[in-house]
Amino acid sequence: MYSSVMAQTLKLSHSPKALASLAEQFKALGDETRLGLMMAVAASEDAEACVCDLTPDTGLAQSTVSHHLKLLVDSGLLNRTQRGKWAYYSLTASAKKLLK
């Protein structure tokens, strides 16, 4: 009975595409490094950060941090803006809702 009610609720409130997107966001946030990067971006000055600012605190290689940031961008949690040599990251509207 519970699964039937749950299935009806999901059908009424969210499309399969919306559920897949939400699942992808939770999957991305399920990694401690990515969650930490999201929190660091949120706490940074002007609510945006460059990979060059985020790398030193992680203890990871810049390429690894960039990989994690790309996954967060692909999942719709971060925006990426290129400025010259560096990419800057900021939270999307959906990420701001999740972190409230």
What does each model-identified segment do?
Residues 1-29, 74-77, 91, 97-99:
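N-terminal leader segment of winged-helix/HTH proteins
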Residues 20, 24-61, 83, 87-94:
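N-terminal helix-turn-helix DNA-binding core of bacterial DNA-binding proteins
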Residues 43, 99-100:
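Short, charge- and proline-biased low-complexity linear segments
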Residues 56, 67, 73-74:
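Alpha-helical residues within the helix-turn-helix
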Residues 61, 66-68:
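Short coil turns linking two alpha-helices in DNA-binding domains
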Residues 68, 76, 84:
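Conserved phosphate-binding and hydrolysis motifs of nucleotide-dependent enzymes
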